[in-house]
Amino acid sequence: MRPDGRKPAQLRPIKIIRDFNIYAEGSVLIEFGNTKVIVTASVEDKVPPFLKGTGQGWITAEYSMIPRASETRSLREVVRGSPSGRTHEIQRLIGRSLRAAVDLKKLGEKTIWIDCDVIQADGGTRVASITGAFIAVADACIKLTKQNLVKANPLKDYVAAISVGKVRNEIVLDLNYTEDSNAQVDMNLVMTGKGEFVEIGATGEENTFSQEDFNKMLEYGKSGIERLIKIQKEFIEGIPSIGHWERKNIKEFVYKE
């Protein structure tokens, strides 16, 4: 039995509130169970120096946790002087994941900044950030298109992420903090709407794992991501093959299994 009573392949309740920030081109508050992340997508009319003059845009991410996002207060990273290695790793993962969903040439010389601020952490903060970021970025791209600031909508596909792991010799989906801290194996999976992989990161925590374990984690993860993309489709109507993307008139959505 899992700590919260879920079945092995069951997602936590998921809640998404759109336009949580009134200033950003796209924003959501996304909740995976007790994990809560504010995600904003902001557009700048400039690109990093290595892209100047190329006609290509860029997507990058920043990630942080407020001091009391977890059981004990932590210092803000700005006070410590620099982001931790974990923070750098998560920021790069979020950026890579969203770049997989956007045609950077169609974006033109613009940068989309994704800011992910964890206000409560109970496992899966990075995958919640990625899943919520797609909606925020999609809203930003749709806004750019409607304002004729890009020639065509740069969105290519949906993208979402989920955690899977092996806890007490059982493969489970969407780990909370208790499960994550006791996991024998931890995997983060990022996939597109077409079912293609952006990232597979599986690590044994002082344990090894078998091909059978890996296959089952992959099976659970793919199934979880398919459900997450269905949730994204409640907010964003997309037909990637013809470049059709529309914002649906929905402010909030709650999903429970």
Swiss-Prot record:
Homohexameric ring arranged as a trimer of dimers. It catalyses: tRNA(n+1) + phosphate = tRNA(n) + a ribonucleoside 5'-diphosphate. It is an enzyme of class 2 (transferase). GO terms for biological process: rRNA catabolic process; rRNA processing; tRNA processing. Phosphorolytic 3'-5' exoribonuclease that plays an important role in tRNA 3'-end maturation. Removes nucleotide residues following the 3'-CCA terminus of tRNAs; can also add nucleotides to the ends of RNA molecules by using nucleoside diphosphates as substrates, but this may not be physiologically important. Probably plays a role in initiation of 16S rRNA degradation (leading to ribosome degradation) during starvation. InterPro entries: ExoRNase_PH_dom1, ExoRNase_PH_dom2, ExoRNase_PH_dom2_sf, PNPase/RNase_PH_dom_sf, Ribosomal_Su5_D2-typ_SF, RNase_PH, RNase_PH_bac-type, RNase_PH_CS. Keywords: Nucleotidyltransferase, RNA-binding, rRNA processing, Transferase, tRNA processing, tRNA-binding. It comes from Sulfurihydrogenibium sp. (strain YO3AOP1). This is Ribonuclease PH.
